[in-house]
């Protein structure tokens, strides 16, 4: 095959950051070895893909052979492309029917997945639609009057459209479930079972997840036909993520967070809380400290969540405070620090949270703020995951989580895939102060107490633009904040 077509491609700058064996331990295959159509290869290379990761090497040829797959691989190792690439190869652009259904548990993940489909398939003439709850149903119905080849969505909305006979799944030969453990939890299992009744009986099923509880195995026995099982989980946590804990009292957490902001070299950070109320209040307090931040949780309107997710992906703000809404599958490669302001209750939640950093074999840092009540949970999670969470040192080696060349971090494509839905609101939501994080911060232990940002002779690190640049929550919204 002539290689002249490659020279005409608009290939992005090479990502020169170091990677771990999570994505480098391959068999040496190339994407051309899978005999993909040239239009698809063009999209793959223009997206910055160079060689398939281990999960892609294993899954793509088996999926193209039209076998059912049950695949288990770590977060951030290329699972999405492992099912999107064969989907785009299997779908026939000239057949104006829904030929592939990709199911995901959250609206943000649906947006992200549909964007991957569009990015990799931009030369293939394949139409992708994303549909989720919280958006205008009429817009989705109107969109389905036009050709749709790949439908990406959350279970509730997909079932609604199929039940109304608006989404015709009778010729949908490929069914994909990402985050299968969550999709088959009590929240979604009955919906998924109902959706399957609208698909052809001989459809192909691809299930991907980082964990496989009993519910997934039961589903496999009932619905999959002699599935090919892939298990790349020699260990649960990503090799590139360094994990620490800081033992602090509840009232010290905010002070400790401020210390971390002044001490760490953060490209982008995600901070997790255990409740929506604490998400909003923490975002307000971070803004009061002079740092820009966004927040996101399930109670927000969908258009507001979309705006936050889109702008954080584009790097317009460096800090995002959120609930577990964004623990599933969200891929923002610029995130190099994850902070558990509230320590999670389960090992599964912990695994998905810290997996937002260290994406695709790169380096990341996870810091857990724990109090006296969290100590047993910390030990339990260490045992279940077979990992070690060390006490935070006085100085953290930057080589553990900072890329030498930050310009190499890829910028995601804009999330413009919610066709027919209303555009995101222009203003950020105003936090409703309904809970308290504790009293005024007290001095924290000496081993993790550098000078506070406002006490230093030099200004805060450049990676934290001040609020005056109108990034994050507009300061005028807090003109008369409640007293704490």
UniProtKB/Swiss-Prot annotation:
Top-level EC class as recorded in UniProt: hydrolase
UniProt xrefs under Gene3D superfamilies: P-loop containing nucleotide triphosphate hydrolases (3.40.50.300)
Phylogenetic placement of the source organism: Eukaryota, Fungi, Dikarya, Ascomycota, Saccharomycotina
Organism in which the protein naturally occurs: Eremothecium gossypii (strain ATCC 10895 / CBS 109.51 / FGSC 9923 / NRRL Y-1056)
CC per GO annotation: cytoplasmic side of membrane; cytoplasmic stress granule; P-body
Binding locations of ATP: 73-80
Protein name: ATP-dependent RNA helicase DHH1
Motif range (Q motif): 29-57
General function of this protein: ATP-dependent RNA helicase involved in mRNA turnover, and more specifically in mRNA decapping by activating the decapping enzyme DCP1. Is involved in G1/S DNA-damage checkpoint recovery, probably through the regulation of the translational status of a subset of mRNAs. May also have a role in translation and mRNA nuclear export.
Record-linked InterPro entries: DEAD/DEAH_box_helicase_dom, Helicase_ATP-bd, Helicase_C-like, P-loop_NTPase, RNA-helicase_DEAD-box_CS, RNA_helicase_DEAD_Q_motif
Pfam families found in the cross-reference section: DEAD (PF00270), Helicase_C (PF00271)
Compartments, record wording: Cytoplasm, P-body
Basic and acidic residues bias (residue ranges): 1-20
Annotated EC: 3.6.4.13
Location of the motif DEAD box: 178-181
Gene Ontology molecular functions: ATP binding; ATP hydrolysis activity; chromatin binding; mRNA binding; RNA helicase activity
Keywords assigned by UniProt, alphabetized: ATP-binding, Cytoplasm, Helicase, Hydrolase, mRNA processing, mRNA transport, Nucleotide-binding, RNA-binding, Translation regulation, Transport
Region (Disordered): 1-23, 429-484
Domain Helicase C-terminal: 240-400
UniProt free text on domains: The Q motif is unique to and characteristic of the DEAD box family of RNA helicases and controls ATP binding and hydrolysis.
GO biological process: cellular response to glucose starvation; cellular response to nitrogen starvation; deadenylation-dependent decapping of nuclear-transcribed mRNA; invasive filamentous growth; mRNA processing; mRNA transport; negative regulation of translation; negative regulation of translational elongation
Domain Helicase ATP-binding intervals: 60-230
């Amino acid at each position: 095959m002539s290689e002249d077509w490659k020279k005409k491609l608009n290939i992005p700058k090479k990502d020169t950051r170091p990677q771990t064996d999570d994505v480098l331990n391959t068999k040496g295959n190339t994407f051309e070895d899978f005999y993909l159509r040239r239009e698809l290869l063009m999209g793959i290379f223009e997206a910055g893909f160079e060689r398939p990761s281990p999960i892609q090497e294993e899954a793509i040829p088996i999926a193209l052979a039209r076998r059912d797959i049950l695949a288990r691989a770590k977060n951030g190792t290329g699972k999405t492309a492992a099912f999107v690439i064969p989907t785009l190869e299997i779908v026939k652009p000239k057949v104006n029917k829904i030929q592939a259904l990709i199911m995901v548990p959250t609206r943000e993940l649906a947006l992200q997945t549909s964007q991957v489909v569009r990015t990799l398939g931009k030369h293939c003439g394949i139409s992708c639609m994303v549909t989720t709850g919280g958006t205008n149903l009429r817009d989705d119905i109107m969109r389905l009057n036009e050709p749709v080849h790949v439908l990406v969505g959350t279970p509730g909305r997909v079932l609604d459209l199929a039940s109304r006979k608006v989404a015709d799944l009778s010729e949908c030969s490929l069914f994909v479930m990402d985050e299968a453990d969550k999709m088959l939890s009590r929240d979604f299992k009955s919906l998924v079972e109902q959706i399957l009744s609208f698909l052809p009986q001989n459809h192909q099923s691809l299930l991907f997840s980082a964990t496989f509880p009993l519910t997934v195995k039961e589903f496999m026995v009932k619905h999959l036909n002699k599935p090919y099982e892939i298990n790349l989980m020699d260990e649960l946590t990503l090799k590139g993520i360094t994990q620490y804990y800081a033992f602090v009292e509840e009232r010290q957490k905010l002070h400790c967070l401020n210390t971390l902001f002044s001490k760490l070299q953060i490209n982008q950070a995600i901070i997790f809380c255990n409740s929506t109320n604490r998400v909003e209040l923490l975002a307000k307090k971070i803004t009061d400290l002079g740092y820009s931040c966004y927040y996101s949780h399930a109670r927000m309107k969908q258009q507001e969540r979309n705006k936050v997710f889109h702008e954080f992906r584009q790097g317009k703000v460096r800090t995002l405070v959120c609930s577990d809404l964004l623990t599933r599958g969200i891929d923002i490669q610029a995130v190099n620090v994850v902070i558990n302001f509230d320590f999670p209750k389960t090992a599964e939640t912990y695994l998905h949270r810290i997996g937002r950093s260290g994406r695709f074999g790169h380096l990341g840092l996870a810091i857990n703020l724990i109090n006296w009540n969290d100590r047993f949970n910390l030990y339990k999670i260490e045992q279940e995951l077979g990992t070690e969470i060390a006490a935070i040192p006085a100085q953290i080696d930057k080589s553990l989580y900072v890329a030498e060349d930050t310009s190499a971090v890829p910028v995601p494509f804009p999330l413009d895939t919610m066709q027919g839905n209303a555009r995101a609101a222009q203003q950020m939501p105003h936090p409703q102060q309904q809970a308290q994080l504790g009293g005024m911060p007290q001095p924290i232990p000496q081993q993790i107490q550098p000078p506070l940002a406002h006490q230093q002779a030099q200004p805060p690190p450049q990676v934290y633009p001040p609020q005056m640049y109108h990034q994050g929550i507009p300061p005028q919204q807090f003109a008369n904040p409640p007293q704490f």
